[in-house]
Regions:
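Short, charged, surface-exposed hinge/linker loops at domain edges
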Residues: 1-9, 43-81
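Prokaryotic Sec-type signal peptides and long signal-anchor helices
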Residues: 9-12, 36
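Hydrophobic residues in alpha-helical membrane-spanning segments
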Residues: 27-30, 65
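Short aromatic-glycine-(Arg/Gly/Cys) micro-motifs in beta-strand/loop hairpins
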Residues: 12-28
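A short, exposed loop/beta-hairpin motif centered on an aromatic-Gly-Thr core
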Residues: 29-40
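A generic structural signal for ordered secondary structure
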Residues: 22-24, 32, 49, 77-78
Length: 81
């Protein structure tokens, strides 16, 4: 049995008002998850992406790829206050 591998960029952010983290994939609109720790959020997001992709495939829809996202980094800017 052949296996096809997919890669997706994910973004993990600190919840603004609650303890924990929130994750989403810019490539898969509507696919998101959360968790108490970064590790739990990453694991939960992996499951959410798997379910999302399986749903797309079951409906015969194309699976978007992260080809447009080639690099992610955080920038810090100093601006006059």
């Amino acid at each position: 049995m052949w296996v096809k591998f997919y890669s997706f960029a994910i973004v993990i952010e600190k919840e603004p008002e609650d303890p924990g983290y929130f994750a989403y994939s810019p490539t898969l609109p509507g696919c998101f998850s959360n968790g108490a720790t970064i590790e739990a959020t990453r694991s939960n997001m992996r499951e959410a992406i798997q379910q999302h992709v399986e749903s797309l495939l079951a409906r015969g829809e194309p699976v978007p790829q992260s080809e447009d996202v080639v690099h992610v980094e955080e920038l810090t800017l100093g601006l006059p206050a």
